Each structure stands twice: as C-alpha cells, then as structure tokens.
C-alpha cells in the first residue's frame, strides 16, 4: 500500500547509480515536488569477481558519489545489497548463454529481473508510488487505449529504449523517466550548475561485471574452467587453423583470429559441442529472417496479425525496415534487406515511429 507524506507530496524512489544521469533525475523529481529517497543497488563486489583493479558500477566510488549527491539534495539515501540475486539471475545466465554459443545481453536481463522488479517491490513496501531512473527514454499513456507506451528518448545518441523493451504495463505505470525529454549536454549542464561531484563523470561503457571486456577470462575465473583450444574450419569443413576456445569468439568477428588465408574472413558460426569455429567471407554473415521468443508487447496487448515495423538487433544499430509475423513461441521478423550477423541471445526490439512496439530474444536466423 502506498502512502503520501503529510504535505501530500507524491513519494518517489530514485535509483542512484552514482552517475550524473540518475543524480540529475533525482534533482528534477525534487524540483517537480516529489518526496524523494535515493537508493543504490549493490549488484557486484569487484573482489569476488576478480575485478578489483577495475572501476565498475556499484563500486565504492559510485556509492560515495551517489551518497554525496543525496546529501547535497537533502534526501534520504540507502544502499541495498542484491549481490546474491545478481549472481544467480544475471551472471550465471550470462555464462550459460555464452557456453551454449549465444551472445547474451545482461543489461536487458538486469533491467528485467533485477532493477525494476526489486526497486518497485521495495518502493511499494515503503509506501512510495514511483520508481525513477536516469534512462533516456519516455513513458506516456495512450489516451485512446489507456496503455502505457515506451518511447525513445529525444536525444537519439543516448536513447535507451532498446534495453527497456521488457517492461510491463504494471511497471510502466509506476516508472518515471525525467531525462527522456533532455539531451545529455543539458543533463551535464544541470549537474555543473548544482556542483554535483559527478557532473563530468564518464558514462559506463562495458558490461558492469566485465569492465575489461575479456568475457572468456572472466568466465574462466568465475567457473574455474579452462576453455580449450580447437579448430578453425572453412565453409567446406576443412581445418584452417587453431583457435583459443570457441567461447572466445563472437559472430561477425574479424580481429584477433590470427588467420592468414589470403582474404579477410569472419566468424560465421560456432559448434560448442565440437569446439569448432567456422570462418568465411563477410557475405556469409547476412540473414533476412529472425525468430524470437520471450516476446514482450508494450504498445499492443499481443501480436495477432503482420505489422510493418522498424527493428534493431543490436543496441546502437540504426533501425531497419521489416515485417513482423506472429509465431507459436514468439514472432518471426522478415527484414526488407539482409542484416549483418543477427545473433542468437541478443534482443530484437520493434518500433513504430518513436514508440516501442515490443521485442524478444533472438533464437535463430535464416537467409
């Protein structure tokens, strides 16, 4: 049950990462008349992940920065420990998908299984109506249908709607995204005007628990396994070299193969059981049809007929024209033009204009 403070201010939980975006989101909500409480989710401990030499999110410095901004805004602040759940729900799935030959997107899983689920539960338990984050996206209610819509952020270069496509109607009703109508330069200007300690802090770029980007080394440290060398194969199945473990390679990769075959070659496939990596020319990477499961629909209750859409199969990819069709376990997406290396395990997100129609997880692709 939610309650309001005696002066009738609506109450909001601010998810504070220690970065500039969530700090400005807190200030904006306070200025809008909300009674705010800052929360930082501790999701990892660097030392337990073998990452003590790196700066990652949830670091002690991030917590210090978030606490300092909360103090400057004179709002309550707490740190909640979700390291055990994060390990089980996010890191272990990340390892499983990579070991099965896919390419996971843990940031999307974190939003779905960790951030919004846990924060909305905590907010409700503490009488708060809303959860606020610093994502660059917008939530609006459709006056005609009553459905809550997820829209792109106005700053196209920072739009984060792709990683939020899994939000439900119930969640969207209680989420506020105050940065959706701003550009990053405006956000930094606000932070500087108010002398926030993190006003010029760099944006995080890598997966938070693998800040050096070496996924295979992280997985070996995490699991205690060693991923053995195996064969590079050409399109005919001929052995053309030796790789350092199939888990170390991603679809479409060219750099770091260590092959001299007279022409550029790219990773075109992996057989995790046989520990082989198939390489070939870049044209072999292009597929036109994508199948997805775990569909989540936002702008519509469900997909019942084909629709024209634009779609992204990677976070920062330009949208591509396509038609989406209902399928038994999700949907089938047929692009107008073949796409480079759509990869199982990644999200495919569908748009109509600036509205997120929905999305799902890629399971397989066809030419």
Regions found by a protein language model. Give the residues of each.
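ATP-dependent adenylation/nucleotidyltransferase module used to activate substrates
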Residues: 1-165, 176, 186
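AMP-forming adenylation/ATP pyrophosphatase catalytic core
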Residues: 20, 132-367
């Amino acid at each position: 049950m939610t309650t309001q403070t005696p002066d009738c201010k609506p109450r909001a939980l601010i998810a504070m990462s220690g970065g500039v975006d969530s700090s400005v989101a807190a200030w904006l909500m306070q200025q809008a008349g909300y009674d705010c409480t800052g929360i930082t989710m501790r999701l990892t401990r660097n030392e337990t992940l073998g990452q003590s030499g790196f700066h990652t999110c949830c670091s002690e410095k991030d917590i210090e920065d978030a606490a300092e901004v909360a103090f400057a805004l004179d709002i309550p602040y707490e740190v909640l420990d979700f390291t055990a759940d994060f390990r089980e729900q996010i890191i272990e799935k990340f390892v499983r998908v990579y070991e099965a030959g896919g390419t996971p997107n843990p940031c999307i899983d974190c939003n779905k299984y960790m951030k919004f689920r846990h924060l909305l539960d905590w907010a409700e338990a503490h009488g708060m109506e809303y959860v606020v984050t610093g994502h660059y996206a917008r939530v609006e209610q459709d006056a005609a249908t009553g459905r809550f819509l997820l829209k792109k952020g106005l700053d196209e270069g920072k739009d984060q709607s792709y990683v939020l496509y899994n939000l439900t109607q119930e969640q969207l009703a209680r989420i506020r995204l105050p940065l959706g109508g701003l550009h990053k330069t405006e956000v930094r200007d606000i932070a500087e005007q108010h002398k926030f300690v993190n006003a010029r802090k760099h944006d995080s770029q890598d997966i938070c628990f693998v800040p050096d980007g070496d996924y295979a080394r992280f997985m070996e440290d995490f699991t205690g396994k060693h991923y053995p060398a195996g064969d590079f194969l050409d399109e005919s199945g001929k052995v053309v070299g030796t790789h350092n473990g199939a888990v170390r390679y991603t679809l479409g990769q060219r750099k770091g193969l260590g092959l001299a075959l007279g022409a550029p070659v790219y990773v075109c496939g992996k057989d995790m059981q046989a520990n082989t990596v198939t390489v070939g020319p870049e044209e072999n990477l292009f597929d036109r049809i994508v199948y997805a499961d775990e569909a989540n629909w936002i702008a519509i209750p469900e997909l019942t007929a084909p629709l024209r859409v634009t779609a992204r199969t990677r976070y920062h990819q330009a949208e591509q024209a396509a038609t989406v069709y209902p399928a038994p376990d999700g949907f089938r997406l047929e692009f107008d033009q073949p796409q480079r290396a759509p990869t199982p395990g990644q999200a495919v997100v569908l748009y109509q204009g600036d509205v997120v129609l929905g999305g799902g997880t890629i399971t397989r692709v066809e030419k």
